[in-house]
UniProtKB/Swiss-Prot annotation:
It is found in: Secreted. This is Cellulose-binding protein A. It comes from Clostridium cellulovorans. Residues 1-28 form the signal peptide. It holds the Pfam family CBM_3.
Length: 1848
């Protein structure tokens, strides 16, 4: 009772709150903020109203100022425009002050409805985005001024909100505040009208037609009424076309937005009261994504055909209606065989076509329906099948298939789409003449030996000097017995070897003589003798060449090769039982030694011993073999494999025992010794190893102080055997790496303690005694004879260096100089405080943008400079090098100039001083090569400008033109100083102007070479470059270029600027940049003629239902129309388009006109295909639409009108204005409508019988389609069948029915839609019901349910009525249930099924049935319930007892799971006992009295019939066989595999591959006894596949398929070796030609570094050019570049990097021998010259000797040079060994002197044919015998420059 009273009280309180709450003001809102206010200017008359407003957040939650509005009410005192000036707005946010001045907004609202004497205007203050948010207690203060546009006075005393007294912010109730549009404080002067709001207030619209979408916003009206939307100009939007309103939701039409310009569109929402609200829409126009056509890249052999696909991607979802794709190909290399449409092309026979003309292919697509067969997805557009023509040479030819001309792609509206085309290639491979390495085939029995030859064919004439090939085989089937060299291998014991590793054999051949024992003919290379292992059936196993074979010819040039696989077929043969041992693994621990035992199972073999062991190493007891611990203790740690040998007649066998030998390893100690040495002397530091137990490999890294010590040499210690092979060392900076590897991996181990290596250090200079460590750094590596890693420890050493005297500090000083631009100046580099310098390396840096090195001359403190001094200039760096070649006699021994650098100054516009300084760390060493200390002094060069720089003026001209015409706009240059290069960008408005052409001006010389221009959108780029860099400068003022613009259509006169944009670049003849200024131009465009407004009028018509009427669409006020798109809408429920005919104003309509009908819309399209000569030029009918009227019951007029936005354009494709006039069609009914009656008949029958119930139709008007649904009680009736009645014509096509539970759906559709109507009354269908068992009789309804549908011949709906029927069920005669035991046949061991069936079933709830059988012959395997038993796991059970079976059924539900139909009650599965081998018939009978009861558990009558089981005699099963049992499937030459079965009385069942079963009809087919395995299935397999043929009895048969993969031919390169010389004059790109062999080039790698394409190398076709700039960065010596391809092995280019040779700068009189190159076997001439003759005046006598390398060069002869006058008298030469004496003597002693530099002699050599490429043979001056001048005074100072011959 108390609870009920509480509930009543709560309910009463809720009712009170419901009545009271609406009248309570929103306290939370009013308390959310306070607004305080005062006027700072209180003058009665003033030109400025100055409100001060303070807004404070008084609530606990944040106050978003974007939601806040404050209104000030006043009289505007005039109609002038007004402005609010926000002087300051600051928010105090905690301790931070935030300026919001720019965020304050003000909106002036004029009161027009009810102004008062104190108010006709209010200003509403708000905040823009980015404003502050106020937390509790925070405030913002606004200070500002309101003024009129003419600054006239306001009268404030009559203003509603004016406060004349306050001087600080106070609450002013006449100032109102709003949050979220709701007023929260203050009182307004008139009605309190809050502003409406919209959300969102901003949006984005994309003009891209694929992305256009309406823009929506929602209004919160706040009691106001929405009025209009206006744009920024005040123009109202059209409420029916520009936007729509649904409730408070406003949708701005995408059609309206699509007309707006890119940028910002502001729409004002206007309401009945309050402020207008702004919706700001950002309009963008993203580019339409280009449809991409990609032509495939394929390979083909010459003479064969290949398919090249053309794929389309980025197909728009709306689809493509038309495509025209012109392609070009190399018709000299390719021939078009066929072109087929791809799978994305629907109805290709109509929509697709192609043409081939010469080397051009045109692919054409046009959706003939213009809508229903568009290309709508990515995929193959077309496939071009080419036949490759023959090519010459061995290099593959790459030919392109690419775009020719402009592709045309159009969408469903025939709007052009951008299209990009990616070119394809066809690589034609030449006929393959490469050498082939082939593996043979063999057949062998298991256990026997098969010899498999490996042959070489097409051996090159240059022979094979080296070969490395790898052969793979299946080690589970084959074992290598031996490998023998073939007869083409000479001296095989020396030249041939092989290794076997698992399933791989490596074959190695090397002609040890490198020439005299080459493989020079085709034949057997090797024979591999395989021993076949046991198999259970015949199997063929592949033997293949794997990896990439390597062959080189007699010149060691790489020989390309191809491979062919072989196989071994192994037959079962005699059963093989090979001997075995157990166990096959064991462990021996040296710390706990014990014998190792294993037991042999000989299987008829004899044990013959253990390989490598004597009988003392093991013992035998019976079949047990023990390996003695004494033998095992001697073995090294690791796995020891012992081979047990057996024999059986001529058969041999082995078994292997692997013993793991274990022992704790020793710890090796590596000790570095100590030593003491004087600075400049050498000392030996030993590295010793102790506790050595047998070391096979060692890697030891030592570190030392390279500023104190220098490694002179490293020698191996005496514990290292064969050190020239096993020991090596590497010095890198301050690190030494010592490496040891026993090359024999066992016989040359380090086996004792001692010195491992001795390091000989030279001590550098020190100023005081110092001890420096030498120690092991990093992680040492030691391994024993098994390559197991050893532990280690290290002991550090040291070297103590004693100082030998004070060290001087050398000072290197760079001088200073001043020079004018373009002139040369000398800058000396001097050395002071010189102690005696043997070597110096000095690097100078300078600004290469200001200075250029002209030359470098050696200073006078350098002796023998041609030998001892050199210099190198690299960019902005100079390296000066000095080395006393005598290491003592030519030291720099005094202070002075080391070198003078002659700089040429570059152009500057003002004086600049640039430093020249020593960079990096100089290196100086004294005569002992001890390093010297140094310091440097920097220098500089001051550059003064040579002349002032002019300022070039580029002026764009002006012009006037009419729309559609062309006008010339010149671009002139003035104040030209001489211009070598110019780049000028001109911008214009591409919506108004189009570039027709650009012509070069007369001031440009050789314009075809020096001038170019590029037009890109609205930008023109003008480019000039004097190709001669001097002789064709622009040297005078004048026109640079003339731009010819075509003016586009305008409706009013407009002037558009044409101006230089960006930053022009001009440079003079020295490429120094020039100053620039520009003058803009313009083009004024005048309209050519007024634009007409086209009127499109749809006509009207009247028609009767079912008839056709013509509705014309006419055009009037036609100005000349090139394109028109018109959409006509109609009501498709009333009208149907019969046809559309083109009007007479359309010329060439089959090309220019089309139409598309889509639902209730007709699209009429016109496009003058000539774009000019077939315009619509007169008023008249554009098209006539022929409508067929549908059936109506009363007269109706339906509109036919232009919908959407029509598009018209004139002959210039300028859009035309238009207006439309709607039409209509009036439809009158043709005749009255009949009402069809559908009647379901009645029938009577007994349970179990079938009765026919007819469904008849009457009052039939002519029915084309009918759908009738009939309902019945499915618990009482079951549909047996449904047949069509006699009023249904062609029922197999027109009639169908569906039964679903208790519902029948009967369907009729006249497939002809007219000639097979139901036209008379009669039976529509007959339903044959079978009556189910029921407990009592009764009548059940059969009636039409749902809503029938009937339609006449016009498909107009026909009215109907229905009459229900029924089935009366009478009691059935009760028959006895009969239980029948079935019969079966089987043999001993078989399991056979004996069914027990029930018939005359009327609904059984329980069954008990007992069967008897002969238990001496039969055994019950299982008993399963039959399909008439529902829920058998619950309702069914059985019991077997001896020879009796009891079967029980009880419907656990006692009603819903009765046995209700005849069928199998149970199946007894008998197993025939193995003793029943003879023929017999044994009965299986029903014994006792069966018990059956119905659903009421009333007992049913029953009867039974016995069964029997016939036992057949045992039959011997013969296994089925197949032939062949082994096949090879070649993926390169695919074919089905046919297998013949010998069934032997069995039946073929299936084929299995492992656990997978092949699919018949897909993976294979069967024809009688032949099974054909599909090549499509075989192509998916890899390796060896075993297919198991399964039969109904007997064993399965197996077919082994060896799948041969498509051979990948490795790509190759030519050449494979190359030389790059770093000498600047000799640097050249390295060009490599690739033979791709069907592969694709991927990259080039140098180790782990990938070269950069386009920078480090370039590709043109199959040619790769490696940049000399990249090659110059490689380290001197050798380098290997790896060419990587998408498949197959990479190819390697081995490079020899020759260091730069810096010829010394020779300033003295000298003999100079040139350096030349020549090929092996060729002759070469070496010039010998005299230079700097002026230094000695003249030469009268010259005698000197030249030596040469006779191992490379053979002397041919010498001829006098051009410097020799009268050579027959004055010149002679003589050869003595490898020395040539040259003699000159002016016999006149004065008249035939040598007075100038020139060629003294030419020596001719022949390069030995055997000389190796890259070898350099020295040709040098051996002795200077005598030189004298005209006074016969001896010339004592003669320098020499030696030469050489390099073998190329």
């Amino acid at each position: 009772m108390q609870k009920k009273k509480s509930l009543n009280l709560l309910l009463a309180l809720m009712m009170v709150f419901a009545l009271v709450l609406p009248s309570i003001p929103a306290l939370a809102a009013t308390s959310s903020m306070s607004v305080e206010f005062y006027n700072s200017n209180k003058s009665a008359q003033t030109n400025s109203i100055t409100p001060i407003i303070k807004i404070t957040n008084t609530s606990d939650s944040d106050l978003n100022l974007n939601d806040v509005k404050v209104r000030y009410y006043y009289t505007s005192d005039g109609t002038q425009g007004q402005t609010f000036w926000c002087d300051h707005a600051g928010a105090l946010l905690g301790n931070s002050y935030v300026d919001n001045t720019s965020k304050v907004t003000a909106n002036f609202v004029k009161e027009t409805a009810s102004p008062t004497s104190t108010y006709d205007t209010y200003v509403e203050f708000g905040f823009a985005s980015g404003r502050a948010t106020l937390k509790k207690g925070q405030f913002i203060t606004i200070q500002g001024r309101i003024t009129k546009s003419d600054w006239s006075n306001y009268t404030q005393t009559n203003d509603y909100s004016f406060d004349a007294s306050s001087s600080t912010p106070v609450v002013n109730p006449k100032v109102t505040g709003y949050i979220g549009g709701a007023k929260v404080l203050g009182t307004a002067p008139g009605p309190d009208v809050p502003s409406s709001i919209i959300n969102p207030t901003s949006a984005t619209f994309d003009k891209n037609v694929t992305k256009q979408a309406d823009v929506k916003t929602t209004m919160t009206l706040n009691g106001n009424t929405f009025k209009t939307i206006t744009d920024a100009n005040g123009t109202a939007l059209n409420a029916s076309t520009d936007y729509s309103v649904s409730g408070n939701d406003v949708t701005i039409s995408k059609a309206y937005l699509a007309k707006q310009s890119v940028g910002t569109t502001t729409l004002n929402f206007n309401f009945s009261a309050g402020n207008p609200q702004k919706l700001v829409i950002t309009v963008v126009d993203t580019p339409v994504e280009a449809v991409t056509a990609t032509i495939g890249k394929v390979q083909v052999n010459a003479g064969e055909t290949v398919a090249v696909p053309v794929n389309l991607t980025k197909v728009p979802a709306a689809g493509l209606a038309t495509i025209e794709l012109p392609l070009t190909f190399d018709s000299a290399s390719l021939e078009v065989v066929s072109i087929t449409a791809g799978d994305i092309v629907l109805n290709p026979s109509v929509n697709f076509s192609s043409t081939v003309s010469g080397s051009t292919i045109k692919l054409l697509f046009l959706d003939d329906t213009l809508g229903s067969q568009l290309i709508t997805k990515d995929g193959v557009f077309a496939t071009i099948t080419f036949k490759a023509k023959a090519i010459t040479g061995t290099t593959a030819k790459v030919t392109s298939v690419k775009l020719a001309g402009t592709p045309v792609v159009g969408d469903a509206q025939l709007q052009e789409k951008p299209c990009a085309v990616n070119p394809g290639t066809v690589t034609i491979n030449p006929i393959d003449n490469r050498m082939q390495i082939s593996v043979g085939t063999a057949t062998v029995k298991a256990g026997e030996i098969a010899a498999v030859p490996v042959t070489l064919t097409s051996v090159p004439s240059t022979g094979i000097a080296t070969a490395e090939a790898q052969v793979s085989f299946d080690a589970t089937l084959l074992e290598v017995a031996s490998v023998t060299a073939g007869d083409i291998v000479l001296n095989p014991t020396v030249n041939f070897s092989y290794t076997v590793n698992g399933n791989v054999i490596k074959l190695l051949f090397l002609d040890d003589t490198l020439g005299s024992q080459l493989i020079s003919k085709d034949g057997v290379f090797v024979t591999i003798n395989f021993k076949a292992k046991a198999v259970t059936s015949t199997v063929t196993t592949p033997v293949t060449v794997s990896g990439t074979p390597v062959f080189a010819d007699g010149t060691l040039a790489e020989v390309q090769s191809k491979t062919a696989a072989g196989s071994v077929t192994i037959n079962i043969g005699d059963p093989i039982l090979e001997p075995t041992i157990s166990p096959v693994t064991a462990t021996f621990d040296k710390k706990a030694p014990a014998d190792v035992a294993t037991t042999m199972t000989l299987n008829g073999y004899t044990f013959n011993g253990i390989t490598g062991l004597t009988t003392s190493d093991y013992s035998i007891s019976g079949n047990v073999v023990k390996i003695s611990q004494a033998y095992l203790a001697k073995q090294p740690v690791g796995d020891l494999t012992l081979t047990f040998n057996f024999s059986n007649g001529n058969k041999t066998a082995t078994a292997k025992l692997v013993v793991s030998i274990k022992d704790a390893p020793k710890t090796v100690t590596a000790t570095v010794g100590t030593a003491t040495v004087n600075a400049g002397e050498t000392v030996a530091v030993p590295v010793t190893l102790s506790n050595v137990s047998g070391i096979s490999t060692a890697e030891l890294q030592l570190s030392f102080d390279a500023t104190l010590l220098e490694v002179v040499s490293i020698t191996a210690g005496d514990i290292v055997l064969n050190p020239s092979v096993n020991f090596s060392s590497v010095v890198n900076g301050s690190t030494i790496k010592l490496l040891f590897l026993d090359d024999t991996l066992g016989s040359q181990l380090i086996s004792k303690d001692g010195v491992f290596a001795t390091i000989n250090f030279k001590a550098k200079s020190v100023t005081s005694t110092v001890t420096t460590p030498v120690k092991v750094s990093g992680t040492p590596v030691f391994a024993d004879g098994t390559l197991a890693e050893l532990s280690y420890e290290t002991v550090a050493g040291s070297v103590t260096i004693n100082a030998i005297g004070p060290v001087k500090t050398v000072t290197a000083t760079v001088g200073t100089a001043t020079v004018k631009s373009g002139e040369t100046v000398a800058v000396p580099v001097t050395l002071s405080n010189v102690p005696g310098i043997a070597t110096a390396e000095l690097q100078l840096s300078f600004d290469a943008t200001l200075l250029e090195v002209a030359s470098i001359t050696v200073g006078d403190i350098v002796l023998n400079p041609s030998v001892n001094f050199s210099s190198v200039v690299n960019g902005s760096t100079i390296k000066l090098l000095f080395l006393d070649d005598t290491l003592g006699s030519q030291l720099i021994s005094k202070d002075g100039v080391l070198a003078t650098i002659n700089f040429k100054a570059k152009t500057v516009t003002s004086t600049v001083t640039t430093p020249v300084a020593v960079s990096g760390t100089p290196v100086f060493a004294d005569g002992t090569l001890a390093e010297l200390q140094s310091k440097t002094v920097a220098g500089s060069v001051t550059i003064e400008p040579s002349q002032p720089v002019k300022t070039v003026t580029a002026t764009v001209g002006t012009a006037t033109v009419k729309s559609g015409e062309t006008v010339a706009v010149p671009v002139t240059l003035s104040n030209v100083p001489g211009i070598a290069t110019a780049e000028l960008q001109v911008g214009f408005d591409a919506t108004l102007l189009e570039v027709a052409s650009i012509t070069v001006g007369d001031i440009v010389l050789n314009p075809s070479v020096n001038f170019s221009s590029v037009v890109n959108g609205s930008t023109i780029k003008l480019l000039f470059l004097d190709d001669t860099l001097g002789s064709q400068l622009i040297s005078k003022d004048g026109v640079l270029a003339t731009i010819n613009f075509k003016a586009k259509t305008v409706t009013s006169k407009v002037t558009t600027p044409v101006a230089v944009s960006g930053t022009p670049v001009f440079a003079d003849g020295t490429l120094a940049e020039l100053n620039m200024k520009t003058v803009a131009g313009s083009v004024t465009i005048e309209p050519s003629q007024p634009v007409k407004t086209v009127t499109a009028t749809v006509g009207t018509a009247t028609v009767k239902s079912g008839e056709t009427v013509a509705v014309p669409v006419t055009l009037s006020n036609v100005p000349g129309i090139a394109t028109a798109e018109l959409q006509v809408g109609f009501d498709a429920t009333l009208l149907e388009v019969a046809s559309i005919t083109v009007g007479d104003i359309v010329l060439n309509p089959s090309v220019n006109f089309s139409s598309v009908v889509n639902g209730s819309t007709i699209k009429l399209l016109f496009l003058d295909d000539t774009l000019g000569s077939q315009l619509i030029s007169k008023d008249g009918v554009l098209a006539t639409i022929n409508f067929k009227a549908k059936t109506v019951t009363s007269k109706v007029t339906t509109p036919v009108a232009v919908s959407g936005t029509p598009v018209f354009a004139d002959g210039t494709l300028a859009e035309l204005k238009y207006e439309t006039v709607a039409g209509s069609v009036t439809i009158e009914p043709s005749q009255p409508v009949k009402t069809v009656t559908a009647t379901v008949g009645t029938a009577t029958g007994k349970v179990g019988e079938t009765v026919a119930v007819p469904v008849t139709l009457s009052n039939v008007p002519g029915i084309a389609t009918a759908e009738v649904q009939v309902g019945f009680d499915a618990t009482l009736l079951e549909v047996a069948s449904i047949t069509a009645g006699d009023i249904v014509l062609n029922p197999s096509v027109n009639f169908s029915s569906v039964v679903n539970g208790s519902t029948i759906k009967i369907l009729f559709l006249d497939d002809t839609l007219g000639s097979q109507l139901i036209s008379k009354d009669g039976v529509f269908a007959t339903i044959n019901f079978k009556i189910k068992a029921v407990p009592s009789t009764g009548t059940t309804p059969v009636a039409i349910s749902g809503t029938p549908v009937f339609a006449d011949g016009t498909l107009a709906e026909v009215q109907y009525k229905t009459v229900a029927g029924s089935v009366t069920i009478a009691a059935a005669d009760i028959k006895a249930v009969k239980a029948t035991v079935g019969t079966a046949t089987g043999k001993a061991g078989d399991t056979v099924a004996v069914p027990v069936t029930l018939s005359n079933v009327s609904g059984i709830a329980t069954v008990e049935l007992q069967l008897s059988f002969d238990a001496t012959l039969l055994e019950v395997a299982s008993i399963t319930a039959g399909d008439i038993v529902l829920n058998p796991s619950v309702n069914f059970s059985s019991v077997v007892n001896g020879s009796t079976i009891k079967i029980l059924f009880l419907d656990d539900t006692l009603g819903s799971q009765l046995i209700s139909k005849d069928g199998v009650f149970a199946t007894v599965n008998f197993k025939v006992k193995s003793t029943a081998t003879n023929s017999a018939v044994t009965p299986v009978t029903v014994s006792g009295t069966p018990v059956f009861a119905d659903g009421t558990l009333a007992e049913l009558k029953s009867e039974s019939a016995a069964g029997r089981l016939t036992i057949l005699p045992t039959v011997i099963i013969v296994d089925s066989t197949v032939a062949p049992t082994a096949v090879t499937f070649d993926k390169a030459n695919q074919a089905d595999a046919a297998i013949t079965m010998t069934l032997n009385g069995n039946t073929f069942s299936a084929i299995k591959n492992g656990t997978a079963t092949l699919v018949k009809g897909t993976d294979y087919t069967v024809s009688e006894n032949v099974v054909t395995i599909s090549k499509a299935y075989l192509a998916k397999q890899t390796g060896t596949v075993t297919l198991e043929f399964v039969f109904d009895k007997g064993n399965s048969a197996k077919v082994v398929v060896a799948v041969k993969e498509i051979q990948i031919v490795n790509s190759t390169i030519t050449p494979v070796v190359a030389t790059f010389e770093k000498t600047a004059a000799k640097q050249a790109d390295v060009v490599v030609t690739m033979s791709l062999n069907g592969n694709t080039f991927s990259a080039i790698k140098n180790g782990t570094t990938t070269l950069v394409k386009g920078t480090d190398y370039t590709i043109s076709g199959s040619t790769v050019t490696i940049s000399k700039a990249y090659l110059a960065t490689l380290a001197d010596g050798s380098a290997t570049l790896e060419f990587v391809f998408n498949q197959g092995a990479s190819a390697k280019l081995r490079l020899t990097i020759v260091p730069a040779v810096v010829d010394p700068v020779v300033t003295d009189f000298a003999v100079k021998i040139d350096k030349v190159s020549a090929a092996a076997g060729s002759t070469v001439k070496v010039p010998v010259s005299l230079i700097n003759v002026s230094k000695v005046g003249n030469v009268c006598v010259a005698e000197y000797k030249i030596s040469f390398d006779s191992s490379v060069l053979t002397y041919v002869g010498t001829t006098a040079g051009t410097s020799i006058k009268n050579p027959a008298v004055n010149f002679s030469s003589q050869l003595n060994g490898n020395t040539i004496t040259l003699l000159f003597f002016d016999n006149t002693i004065g008249n035939e002197l040598i007075t100038a530099d020139g060629q003294f002699a030419t020596i001719e050599f022949k390069v030995n044919a055997a000389a190796t490429s890259g070898t350099t043979a020295e040709v040098k001056v051996a002795t200077i015998s005598s030189f004298a001048d005209a006074s016969l005074t001896e010339i004592t100072k003669v320098a020499t420059v030696n030469g050489s011959v390099k073998v190329s």
